Amino acid sequence: MSEMTPREIVHELDTHIIGQHDAKRSVAIALRNRWRRMQLDVDFRQEVTPKNILMIGPTGVGKTEIARRLAKLAKAPFIKVEATKFTEVGYVGKEVEQIIRDLTDSAIKMTREDQMKKCKFKAEEAAEERILDALLPKPKEDWDNEKPDDSATRQIFRKKLREGQLDDKEIEIDVAAPQVGIEIMSPPGMEEMTNQLQSMFQNMGPGDSKRRKMPIKEAYKLMIEEEAAKLVNQDDMKEQAIELVEQHGIVFLDEIDKICKRGESSGPDVSREGVQRDLLPLVEGCTVNTKHGMVKTDHILFIASGAFQMSKPSDLIPELQGRLPIRVELSALTADDFKRILTEPHASLTEQHVAMMGTEDVKIEFTEDGIESIAQAAWQVNERTENIGARRLHTVMERLMEDLSYDASDKSGNTFVIDAEYVSSHLDDLVQDEDLSRFIL
């Protein structure tokens, strides 16, 4: 789990996301509170529940990007889901409990990788011995002898193997046969039963090994994975993963505004209000049955986000509103924000285009006034048509760089300067013509 302070988390988010300081502070405090809670006494720790967050802001201002970056910083089980993918229990579509099952699967993967790293040294030793056995098979009379072979020849081959002199030599080895993939069409709401059936059929399949011929370099990597997998205790791994989910799990619910009930309508609303009702026990705290064991959701942190352009947060059912106590509003982006987005973040849009053209030996230089013109053009199109936030910059940049990208292979060694005049000549007609802006930008 991450031990970064809120200030460090905000600083890390600042390298990728421009503005939205309030939202960054809220998620940073929430992430730090996960660590603070774990420092408390076990009895008192159970009483401290996470304060879930609702992020409100127009599209393209950084809500989803904050979630993506937070996932990398958290070093904890994290899953991002679209609220629109789920329906009420009993109807066609995914049940909300699938969120916790997917979160548990990601924790299992994380724990397995962590345990395999810990036993990597032993796995490398075992893989080395298997390769040497394939290169120097024991005499028939020594097959039952368990003593390690420390002959001079074996040591010479061991030295060559470690120095990489045998990498290209082909050997024939026994590797675990791949599991047979069995696809089962699941009835609505029965995904968990389907998963269990798939696991059962796969375990019934042939568990023996298969003889394959491959270069030593490739065989060594494969054997390390096999040996590491043998050293991992599956029961301990599952226990650790479930503990990790229950104490540190984070769920990011995107597009929650799309499941608000709009206006007065009669009849069941299975993909909106029904989903909200099903989310209540998850957010409040319940026990979900997964194929790895029972998972309690009492201390899982939920971060919900939505644009709320066609609805408002008060359109959520009151019970769900009460379970999202921290509200953060993200502001719409200005032309100055666009200018900063083009230059300040790590691997910014301008840096990406310079690097891409550099592969063709074409040098691109963006001037200060050129960047200002691009930012202004994107902002104007957003104001006149639909405001899609920073995503508009991608459209504008692709349109601006289209000619250069097409001719780059024929202009190797040349330098091109993207200044205000260049931007004006390529974008002015589209920006000024509202009809063209709607269809092209």
From Swiss-Prot:
SUPFAM superfamilies: P-loop containing nucleoside triphosphate hydrolases (SSF52540)
Cellular component, GO, one term: HslUV protease complex
One Gene Ontology term from the biological process aspect of the record: protein unfolding
Subcellular location per the Swiss-Prot or TrEMBL entry: Cytoplasm
Gene Ontology MF terms in the entry: ATP binding; ATP hydrolysis activity; peptidase activity; proteasome-activating activity
CDD domains listed in its UniProt record: RecA-like_HslU (cd19498)
Described purpose of this protein according to its UniProt entry: ATPase subunit of a proteasome-like degradation complex; this subunit has chaperone activity. The binding of ATP and its subsequent hydrolysis by HslU are essential for unfolding of protein substrates subsequently hydrolyzed by HslV. HslU recognizes the N-terminal part of its protein substrates and unfolds these before they are guided to HslV for hydrolysis.
Family listed: Belongs to the ClpX chaperone family. HslU subfamily.
Protein name stated in the entry: ATP-dependent protease ATPase subunit HslU
